[in-house]
């Protein structure tokens, strides 16, 4: 197991470097000067603009920290490689840089935003696990019944409907239609993350974003669960258990479910990292004060330190979760050995 973990960590390094390097290269392709956008409607003076470029390491400087000028008096731009190495050096020291627009360290901004994103993703994962696994089991056990047809139809609709559009439909129904129909007696928060003195009211703000974020993933989890459970139920050892007179409940709970859960757990585990990145649209629709919404705004304003910090954080989380999911294989199924025949899980 130890050798396997070390091997996977070493495999993560080129992936991480590749993703961050590609994103750095894209910054040069996307039109628009982020420094000129700092002033908003007011144009920055050449002196202030040059100071900002020096501060954000966008131009080369001498030993005294002054910008190096070329023959025409223009500042010499810092190369992509130099900026990348400068960013990676800061990253090793826990520094994600400073936001162009907000003038604050990116780590401080994310420290405020990250709890909201993690809690939203955690709620969505719990909903996905409960509803997806439960619906998949019911659909497989009640094959070709009304419940199977209902689950199949519902999952097909959820897969086809874009999550952000579902979010807007939920806002329309609970925030307008249902509220007007009941004279305001029944309503649901459709924006923000609360902040009131009532914990109940704060948690109510999580309901619609959680449903939106978990909708597509829950549908896929239910499909995988149904397919895997039906496949396991056709295995020889299940037929042997039936021949011994075990009840269907005992067969499913003690024998079939554990093996059928492995691909589902894999999907749900990996999906947590996907939710952290996929939460960008959901957080934007519901004006959620999380990292996704912050990154979305940063993209529109060319605030690259926040974009880089958000992507870096997501990549690290996804890689760690993938490793934890792989390790969990050995605990779900003792037949699986991650480190080879000589490495006991």
Residue spans of the language-model regions?
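Hydrophobic alpha-helical segments of integral membrane proteins
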Residues: 9, 48, 80-96, 106, ...
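Hydrophobic alpha-helical transmembrane segments of membrane transport/permease proteins
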Residues: 16-81, 178-202
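An internal, D/E-rich "acidic patch" concept
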Residues: 62-133
